[in-house]
């Protein structure tokens, strides 16, 4: 799947999206993957960050997530330390959020991008009018978590405040054309001390900052599977501290073989998410072992699934377009709601329009399924109103 598609592909999507659906809601986008590579290069140069890359060309090759340098979730995530360092600090977070929102509004409905992620389509099919951004504020403090330090160069309180101010400024600039808010991610690759600090910060700031929509659990599943009941209980406590009953809950779980079906089920029951990202293990267990417990749990609790097509294929969570079609049909079979998002559009040189065209071109989704997913996103968003 490439960022540049044929005119026929563009026509397919344009025919499917009716005039009244030209403003879409996107639920699953990471801030670290939403700033175009050429802008990250400029930010790194401006901040004098050492060792970003030997050249601009090397930088693009390093950060661009493709089939040549990915292969599984761990490899997919390995360059995010560089991005988080470039985005460290209140001003860098503000700049990143403004760029991400501008990009979503301008290029989300485009079918062609330039080599650095700049928009290249003069006639976008739609705009993104509501966008949920997720990131980990602790990873924007400038700290190297591999050294086990719980705090960094920058104040996390100022980072959270700066993010919320940037969101409000963007909405004013667009005159209501785009609305946004944040999911703050606990890290599977962070210590319990750091994750607890984040939980307490969210609990404090959610009282005054309406742009804080919810919490998430993200990062490499290999680093923390939560198969240990004691660890799962700890994470559930952090979700309760941060989200309580007034914030949305979503969780990355079941994307890789590191998490089996039993752990997937236990995680859903303990963390009580409203939405779940990439729950591939639930479908694969049904296909391979005829074990429908995961799918039945998602249906029973009316949990919405966040599907990110290109990243799921890059990490080998889903093999190809044909298997993606099977995945979607399986969710429909069990009456499970789902939405489509880009995950890290800038790093994959993709757009939401590009992802949807890919599905249509390969007959992995029908127009009816696509329109239903649009409506589901509008209903499932944590952005109120």
Which role fits each region the language model picked out?
Residues 2-249, 253-385:
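Metal-cofactor-binding active-site regions of metalloenzymes
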